[in-house]
Amino acid sequence: MIREERLLKVILAPHISEKSTVNAEKHNTVVFRVAIDATKAEIKAAVAKLFEVEVESVRTLVSKGKTKRTGGRTGRRSDWKKAYVTLAAGADIDFVGGAE
């Protein structure tokens, strides 16, 4: 069993983009930015507990940080992990939470 404290630290933010919006509409998939050391099992448990939905599958990828220049100095952005979470049929996560 994964501790609740760890589950709260796994999901950092939803990742909203054109691609993630199309995935949400066509394949019932939600995209999250997650902790770099998070496992698929932790991500699945965190989404199920925090949003009270049933998760079918989790796919992950690590996006490498870009090298950026500021004046004469070069720096590097941090690597980050993205998770594509496929929800069960009929399940939905509403990030906007607009008034009905």
Curated annotation (Swiss-Prot):
Pfam families: Ribosomal_L23
Keyword Phosphoprotein: no
A GO MF term: rRNA binding
Alphabetical GO biological process terms: translation
Keyword Cytoplasm among record annotations: no
Keywords carried by this UniProt record: Ribonucleoprotein, Ribosomal protein, RNA-binding, rRNA-binding
Record text on subunit structure and interactions: Part of the 50S ribosomal subunit. Contacts protein L29, and trigger factor when it is bound to the ribosome.
Protein function: One of the early assembly proteins it binds 23S rRNA. One of the proteins that surrounds the polypeptide exit tunnel on the outside of the ribosome. Forms the main docking site for trigger factor binding to the ribosome.
Protein's recorded name: Large ribosomal subunit protein uL23
Species whose genome carries this gene: Shewanella oneidensis (strain ATCC 700550 / JCM 31522 / CIP 106686 / LMG 19005 / NCIMB 14063 / MR-1)
